[in-house]
Curated annotation (Swiss-Prot):
The gene is thrB. Catalyzes the ATP-dependent phosphorylation of L-homoserine to L-homoserine phosphate. GO terms for biological process: threonine biosynthetic process. It catalyses: L-homoserine + ATP = O-phospho-L-homoserine + ADP + H(+). ATP binds at P84, M85, S86, R87, G88, L89, G90, S91, S92, S93, A94. It is found in: Cytoplasm. Keywords: Amino-acid biosynthesis, ATP-binding, Cytoplasm, Kinase, Nucleotide-binding, Threonine biosynthesis, Transferase. This is Homoserine kinase. One of its GO terms (molecular function) is ATP binding. It comes from Sulfurimonas denitrificans (strain ATCC 33889 / DSM 1251). Pathway: Amino-acid biosynthesis; L-threonine biosynthesis; L-threonine from L-aspartate: step 4/5. Belongs to the GHMP kinase family. Homoserine kinase subfamily. It comes from the Bacteria.
Length: 293
């Protein structure tokens, strides 16, 4: 059995803990019953020996498999990871979602994407990453009574993502400590209005307004100060024609949305200006979680 989950970019602009989208950079896990437990990793994390034992995936998988079957069974897991770890591209959400889906498949129990999403909420209390990881596309999401409520927009082929990935990790927990403890009414209204406009822009495919709509006063500046070069990344992206340019998740990756015809030019300018960072052009992913038996 094979499970794959895409990378995600969340906290989009003013959409703190509420807006996210999926990009075509995937973590894949293949698994089957085995006499002995074993883990192999290729790609991201392959040189980290701690991940080859009782990692987050294995812990969540075992929890759900044992709950569903009431029995013990060893499995061989082969991981093929493309999503950089702790870079603001949803690596943790990919692990959580793939573990839950894998456990249900291993137990022979069909489960809806919505059910998997709500299970994932136990491990990731904010829906902006886990929702696009499961559903794909652009998502506006909220949590009410321990359930995720969301709306998805399919993203067209004529827009692309350009991501700038610094060689610096940023944990979500640490990034949250950088945020203000309170916000003014003015800032709250600013972000509410810009979030509403951002959602409307995505659903109406009115991309040109995103440069205004994606402005934020809640989280980006406080987090970007830990890596000041990101302010210049955003400046160069906008000067080169990006439709929106925003911190991805809690960082350190910076995400820009661009027209397909501009993607090579914008990526080249960013790579030339910031040679110490990785720059990738990515398609958007509209599938989310994929299960192949």
């Amino acid at each position: 059995m094979t499970i794959s989950v895409p990378a995600t970019s969340a906290n989009l602009g003013p959409g703190f803990d509420s807006l996210g989208l999926a990009v075509d950079l995937r973590n894949v896990v293949e698994f089957h019953p085995s006499k002995f437990f074993s883990v192999s990793i290729k790609g991201e994390g392959e040189n980290n020996p701690k991940l080859k034992g009782n990692n987050l995936f294995i812990s969540i998988f075992n929890e759900h498999y044992n709950r569903l079957t009431k029995k013990k069974q060893n499995f061989k897991f082969n991981f093929y990871n493309q999503i950089p770890m702790s870079r603001g591209l949803g690596s943790s959400s990919a692990v959580i979602v793939s573990a839950i889906a894998s456990a249900h498949e291993a137990a022979g129990i069909k489960v809806s994407k919505r059910r998997i999403l709500n299970h994932a909420l136990v491990y990731e209390s904010h829906p902006d990453n886990i929702t696009p990881a499961v559903m794909g596309g652009f998502n506006a999401a909220t949590v009410e009574k321990n359930k995720v409520f969301s709306q998805k927009k399919h993203l067209p082929d004529y827009i692309k993502a350009v991501v700038v990935i610094p060689n610096k990790q940023m944990s979500t927990a640490k990034a949250r400590t950088l945020l203000p403890k309170s916000y003014s009414k003015e800032s709250a209204v600013y972000n509410l209005s810009h979030t509403a406009l951002s959602v409307a822009a995505f659903f109406n495919e009115d991309w040109e307004i995103l440069k205004i709509a994606s402005q934020d006063r809640f989280h980006q500046k406080a987090r970007m100060k830990t890596l000041p070069e990101l302010f210049n990344v955003q400046k160069v992206a906008y000067e080169s024609g990006a439709l929106m340019s925003t911190l991805s998740g809690s960082g350190s990756t910076f995400f820009s949305m661009v027209y397909d015809e501009d993607s090579e030019m914008i990526a080249s300018k960013l790579a030339l200006k910031f040679p110490e960072f990785a720059v990738k052009i990515l398609n958007f992913d509209n599938d989310g979680l994929i299960i192949d038996k």
